[in-house]
Design a protein with these regions (language model features):
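His/acidic metal-ligating clusters that form di-metal
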Residues: 8-11, 23-116
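Serine/threonine-rich low-complexity intrinsically disordered regions
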Residues: 19-20, 72, 176
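Binuclear metal-dependent phosphoesterase catalytic core
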Residues: 1-4, 94-96, 115-186
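Short, solvent-exposed loop/turn segments at secondary-structure boundaries
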Residues: 22-25, 138-140
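Short, solvent-exposed loop/turn segments at secondary-structure junctions
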Residues: 15-17, 61-64, 131-134, 153
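Active-site-proximal beta-strand elements of phosphoester/diester hydrolases
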Residues: 6-16, 58, 124-131
Length: 186
């Protein structure tokens, strides 16, 4: 028989630099992209009997909401931020669209080499990968990758950093809109 999707992965283009005259810095999502996301999310939710499928989103440049989430002392913070986040200067509303649609449980970005944290904001985990290449102009974290494990039928996931030498750090569980460190994790 035909199988239905159990989860969604959104791989999106957050662009590179601003294309708006007079606004410097990094790019952001366009309204067309946000509309595309909302349409896909609504279609999958409708096909699933009105219940949003659990989803993860991946793109390069952090959303502006990362900054406030990391700096909020009431949030649980797991990982490191050895530099400031570098989102685009304008906030087009992609995070609001994800909160309203109800499917995305985690957003993972890169771009900033010295950040690898995970923090929850409005029921969505906001996380960074880990710098995985060789030396660049800056990278104070050890090279590694962020791994994610989804469990079918659950609206959550586990994630951790696997460093190049095999060391596992910051094993995190995301359930019910909250992150927590898994016991026996560095």
């Amino acid at each position: 028989g035909k199988k239905s999707p159990a989860a969604l992965l959104y791989c999106l283009d957050s662009h590179d630099y601003s294309t708006v005259e007079g606004i410097d810095g990094y790019g952001w999502f366009t309204q067309d992209q946000i509309r595309w996301y909302r349409d896909r999310s609504a279609a999958y939710t409708g096909a699933n009997g009105g219940k949003p499928l659990p989803a993860l989103a991946f793109f390069h440049i952090a959303l502006p909401e990362y900054v406030a989430a990391w700096r909020n002392p009431d949030n649980t913070h797991i990982g490191r931020a050895a530099e400031d986040e570098c989102p685009g200067e304008l906030n087009p509303g992609m995070f609001a669209a994800m909160v309203e649609s109800g499917d995305v449980t985690g957003v993972f970005v890169g771009h900033d080499h010295d950040i690898d944290y995970v923090v929850a904001e409005k029921g969505i985990a906001l996380g960074y990968g880990r710098f995985s290449g060789d030396d660049t102009t800056y990278n104070n974290l050890r090279p590694g990758v962020r791994l994610l494990v989804l469990t079918e039928g659950e609206r959550g996931f586990e994630t951790w950093i696997h460093e190049r030498d095999g060391r596992i750090v910051d094993h995190v569980e995301f359930r019910d809109g909250r992150i927590s460190k898994v016991k026996n994790s560095n």
